[in-house]
Regions:
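Long, highly charged low-complexity segments
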Residues: 1-80, 94-114
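Active-site-proximal helix-loop-helix substrate-binding element of RNase H-like nuclease domains
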Residues: 37, 71, 75-171
């Protein structure tokens, strides 16, 4: 009955056009070629050492936190992502309900030296959020670069500076 009422008001539903613009087609082709073998779920504390060593060797690491809230002051830490080389990254679950989650305090203790090391650049999107989340856990991030702020400084009024927009523009 609800469907017939909707049809009487709005008419028969029409399928979207199958025409795909070039930008969407190129993007989907690029996605289909992504090799996921170098994206790792960290399942034990010892695996983190390899990622710390790599970040120290390279001198920079992209870092991102996953949390339970968009408010960093109220957010609980759920996971941490690290990436020092293109096409290679890891995710460390610390607040998941599954058995794959690693003890948060032990992970924080292990990552503290790296994240506070001023000789290793930490790169993030809206990294001030991550700064607050880590600070709540006793880590003071140092030597940070924020892609959101970089975008704003370079093109303040040109675009939005969120990750989706920046990905569309630069990737």
């Amino acid at each position: 009955r609800l469907l017939s009422s909707a049809i009487s008001v709005y008419g028969e539903p029409k399928l979207a056009s199958a025409n795909i613009d070039d930008k969407t087609l190129k993007y989907s082709e690029k996605l289909s070629t992504i090799d996921n073998k170098n994206y790792h779920l960290i399942t034990n504390l010892d695996q983190i050492d390899k990622w710390i060593n790599e970040a120290e060797e390279v001198g920079e690491v992209a870092v991102d936190t996953e949390t339970t809230s968009l408010d960093p002051h109220q957010a609980d830490l759920v996971g941490i992502s690290l990436c020092s080389k293109i096409g290679k990254a890891c995710y460390i679950p610390v607040g998941h309900r599954s058995s794959k989650s690693i003890d948060k305090d032990k992970v924080i203790k292990k990552l503290k030296k790296l994240l506070e090391d001023s000789s290793v650049k930490k790169i993030g999107q809206n990294i001030k959020f991550d700064f607050i989340v880590f600070f709540k856990h006793g880590i003071t991030l140092s030597s940070m670069e924020d892609t959101m702020l970089m975008s704003y400084v370079l093109d303040a009024g040109k675009n939005r500076h969120n990750m989706d927009t920046l990905s569309d523009i630069h990737l």
